[in-house]
Amino acid sequence: MISAVLDTQGDHPQQQAGDRAAPSVPVPGNKTVLPLARPNPNRKRVLFVTSEIADLVKTGGLGDVSAALPRAMAHLHDVRVLIPGYPQVLHSENPIHIIGELGGHAALPACKIGRMDMPDGLVIYVLICPELYEREGTPYGANNGRDWPDNHIRFARLGLAAADIAANLAQIHWCPDLVHAHDWPAGLAPAYMHWRGQRTPTLFTIHNLAYQGVVSLASCPELGIPEHALQQEGMEFYGKLSFLKAGMAYASHITTVSATYAQEITTPAFGCGLDGFLASKTQQGLLSGIPNGIDESWDAATDAHLLTPFSIGDWDGKAANAAHVRQMFGLDASSGPLFAVVSRLVYQKGLDLTEAVAEFIVQSGGQIAIIGRGEPEEEQSMRALARRFPGRIGVHIGFNETDARRMFAGSDFLLMPSRYEPCGLSQMYAQRFGSLPVARNTGGLADTIENGVTGFLFDESTVASYQEALTRAFKVFAYPALLNAMRCRAMAAPFNWCKAVEPYAELYEQLVAKALGQAARQ
């Protein structure tokens, strides 16, 4: 619901940093992230710029992080989120009050800024521009899977709005000390700020290097991109423009979502054509990896989504969840292992490898439950598997949080044969619910799974390597004491955001201090 009254006083000054005590942070599941002991004078105002947030609209891990990290950071810094006004946002149960207006630039239309206050205190700024964002579908395309042809306009408008807010052009009585932009849709935020000579520091986080927001050079006039940006050191990318590269080129610092992935993307195998550029950033000390966390709602003992909550050692409770998952997917009753796939159905996720080992899993006494949506050809392949192995493999095309949580709780193993995985969240969710990942030894999977302790890793993106890891999983399943010991270790793994937040908080403080120092010398 959008308030029809324009609040000419803008945002509320009493909500600025330093004017209220640092609270504990409510998160889903009636859990609380306890404050870390840090001095309040270091508290900064931070604007998160993102194309999705799990509370309102989500297509993947970016939405989860955009919802969890600002909340986990709330006791350290005043973090607010800027997101486009999609229908899912405008028609949520949370009221929106118009607090400011922004003029247009080049082909980017004028828009309004709305403020949404979430029940737990998170402030979300909504970029209201009906001609760009009020469309049925995902944040990036129509329901038929095709990207919107004007995405370059839609997300350039998002980046420019962030720059405008940082320059206080929106006059909302809140101005960030730092702008934290996420993935290619927010890539032009650091760029516009740099081109204008704004001194506010910027941080750009790469969640997935493969999605680069590449558009034609002919888009420059529409977006107001200066000619000097069309260089290898700028946002030029093999004769085109890359929103992702713009974020990397002009941000004060770059992070990605795991230490291993930060190393991998500086190599040709994982660099997506940007390995040399990123290697240079690493050498300059401008690229680092900070792992994601997961919120404390991922607790099998208290999760309201589960029909039978259970705790470490309560394996009868886990078995009850397994029986429910088998019923959900039309699988036969079985005492064998249940494997889960909870994933976007895209090439990156290695689903063709799972398709190739499916017969081995079934012949060895296992079953597979698959949930997800994505590329049409991948969806068709998964449906074909279910038809080929009725009662042994079940597929649901689509996604909802409740079913996903129940699958993590009911499965014995999670299949994640990703060709690359910047961080990955599913493997952490699964471990919290006692489901052991069978995963490729890459990116965040390598950083969050202890091979033979909390899961099973394999090195090569081949059927043989994958099948060897599955063989180890079947052997462990045959020894309940060993299986349960691994489950205990997995469920106790420390993946909460409290641990992940500290490096971000320190980086924020360093970037702001550096920017202030540079300004003082000029």
From Swiss-Prot:
Alphabetical keyword list: Glycogen biosynthesis, Glycosyltransferase, Transferase
Intrachain disulfide bonds: none
EC identifiers of the protein: 2.4.1.21
One of the GO BP terms on file: glycogen biosynthetic process
Record bears the keyword Transferase: yes
Positions in coiled-coil regions: none
Pathway in which the depicted protein is active: Glycan biosynthesis; glycogen biosynthesis
Residues holding ADP-alpha-D-glucose: 58
Molecular-function annotations in GO: alpha-1,4-glucan glucosyltransferase (ADP-glucose donor) activity; alpha-1,4-glucan glucosyltransferase (UDP-glucose donor) activity
Record region (Disordered): 1-29
Matches recorded under Pfam families: Glyco_transf_5 (PF08323), Glycos_transf_1 (PF00534)
The reaction(s) this protein catalyses: [(1->4)-alpha-D-glucosyl](n) + ADP-alpha-D-glucose = [(1->4)-alpha-D-glucosyl](n+1) + ADP + H(+)
Role this protein plays: Synthesizes alpha-1,4-glucan chains using ADP-glucose.
PANTHER family: GLYCOGEN SYNTHASE, GRANULE-BOUND STARCH SYNTHASE 1, CHLOROPLASTIC/AMYLOPLASTIC
Protein name as catalogued: Glycogen synthase
Organism field: Pseudomonas fluorescens (strain ATCC BAA-477 / NRRL B-23932 / Pf-5)
Lineage of source species: Bacteria, Pseudomonadati, Pseudomonadota, Gammaproteobacteria, Pseudomonadales
Gene this chain is encoded by: glgA
